[in-house]
Amino acid sequence: MDIRAAEISAILKNQIKNFGQDAEVSEVGQVLSVGDGIARVYGLDNVQAGEMVEFPGGIRGMALNLESDNVGVVIFGSDRDIKEGDTVKRTGAIVEVPVGPELLGRVVDALGNPIDGKGPINSAIRSRVDVKAPGIIPRKGVHEPMSTGIKAIDALIPVGRGQRELVIGDRQTGKTAIILDTFLNQKPAHDAGGDDKMFCVYVAIGQKRSTVAQFVKVLEERGALKYSIIIAATASDPAPMQYLAPFAGCTMGEYFRDKGQHALIAYDDLSKQAVAYRQMSLLLRRPPGREAYPGDVFYLHSRLLERAAKLSDERGAGSLTALPVIETQGNDVSAFIPTNVISITDGQIFLETDLFYQGIRPAVNVGLSVSRVGSAAQIKAMKQVAGSIKGELAQYREMAAFAQFGSDLDAATQRLLNRGARLTELLKQPQFSPLKVEEQVVVIFAGVNGYLDKLAVSDVGRFEHGVLSYLRTEGKDILDAIRTEKAISDDVKGKLKAALDTFAKSFA
């Protein structure tokens, strides 16, 4: 065997010369106690609030309570695999999630990990989950419509791009259905490929997995998943994941807002996020306040919803519109969380169980629902026709309450009640059938101009269906004119009246 001393010594000299002296310092701590999704950790002296830490086995956590002798960490995963004495490492990074167009069409958890079995997400950009909302100067007033495709909302409670509109109601009143229809209504804009298309983000908090799966299935079947991102922190996920999911979703939506594009985010629902946050806070021994929620539960929701904004032209004029959902108990909107969120948002859509069971669907209580942005978020054509419907419905509700007692009503009151009943019928709409704005304008125009007054209430839906079919074939120029001009000129008004007269004669 030939031993070459010179060669061996050269290799050794080379290794000694290139020996790396830069040792890696990572700050570690030890688990003192663990339970209920909370770990108390000793050490980690320089950890930041909201920093991601790592437990053995790759389980992540977030440092929330920085106390004098220990750190309270919430665990994003099962605490079964963590035991006393385990080593905890700092990552040096505040909690981040992947963002960008690569997430479109995917279902992810609160940390941005895919849970839909379609492989990894190759997004190069990561953003912090909890960032400061834009200030006053970078913003602009809300002035562009965000069309939901639902007549009752687009006509009476218009939502603009960059607005926060609360959807509030008891369980099983159709809150998620409104969000689903709004998502589906963005499809024509995506198919047309214009700049005004909206990307949709849906955050499911504390829901059943089957419900989320059903939501995704409907989006997929109707071709709406390609422009949507679903963040799911289901009922079986730990409370910290349910707390984090809305912030993660908001960050993903902000990516589009900051690029000068438009995004719509729905939080379904924030009551469950508040419950998850209450659980975490109580386990971290933070002092409880009203209804045992922590003192900063208002700040939890306000800092989240303030991130929805319409940015100024200098910032690219992008927008993020938020549709938070709150579930009430027995129509009690004066509870703690509902009143908080009502005061943060720019209006609310009230859904009522009674209306739902009367067959008025969407079950929107038009009297209690408001949009504080109002007609600034409507096209002129819609303002022209919807202005009078609000007043007529308000008078109708007032009269209907009195009419229960009196049998002999004068002709004017009778006329008002008849018109109101038909307008209420006109605002009904089946699920998964969002209407284009110009079609809504035509239908409401027919309602407020007395074309329904002679019909039986049961025929209103059939009449609406017939009018739209007729105009899509015979009156295409009228619909096109309303869509392009965004207003009803005298010329278009004349044509529309003539078309409605012609159809009304043939309708039987």
Swiss-Prot record:
InterPro entries: ATP_synth_asu-like_sf, ATP_synth_asu_C, ATP_synth_asu_C_sf, ATP_synth_F1_a_nt-bd_dom, ATP_synth_F1_asu, ATPase_a/bsu_AS, ATPase_F1/V1/A1_a/bsu_N, ATPase_F1/V1/A1_a/bsu_N_sf. CDD domains: ATP-synt_F1_alpha_C, ATP-synt_F1_alpha_N, F1-ATPase_alpha_CD. ATP binds at G169, D170, R171, Q172, T173, G174, K175, T176. Produces ATP from ADP in the presence of a proton gradient across the membrane. The alpha chain is a regulatory subunit. Belongs to the ATPase alpha/beta chains family. This is ATP synthase subunit alpha. F-type ATPases have 2 components, CF(1) - the catalytic core - and CF(0) - the membrane proton channel. CF(1) has five subunits: alpha(3), beta(3), gamma(1), delta(1), epsilon(1). CF(0) has three main subunits: a(1), b(2) and c(9-12). The alpha and beta chains form an alternating ring which encloses part of the gamma chain. CF(1) is attached to CF(0) by a central stalk formed by the gamma and epsilon chains, while a peripheral stalk is formed by the delta and b chains. Disulfide bonds: none annotated. GO terms for cellular component: plasma membrane; proton-transporting ATP synthase complex. The record marks S369 as: Required for activity. GO terms for molecular function: ADP binding; ATP binding; proton-transporting ATP synthase activity, rotational mechanism. Keywords: ATP synthesis, ATP-binding, Cell inner membrane, Cell membrane, CF(1), Hydrogen ion transport, Ion transport, Membrane, Nucleotide-binding, Translocase, Transport. It comes from Allorhizobium ampelinum (strain ATCC BAA-846 / DSM 112012 / S4) (Agrobacterium vitis (strain S4)). PROSITE patterns: ATPASE_ALPHA_BETA. It is found in: Cell inner membrane. It is a peripheral membrane protein. Its EC number is 7.1.2.2. It is an enzyme of class 7 (translocase). It catalyses: ATP + H2O + 4 H(+)(in) = ADP + phosphate + 5 H(+)(out).
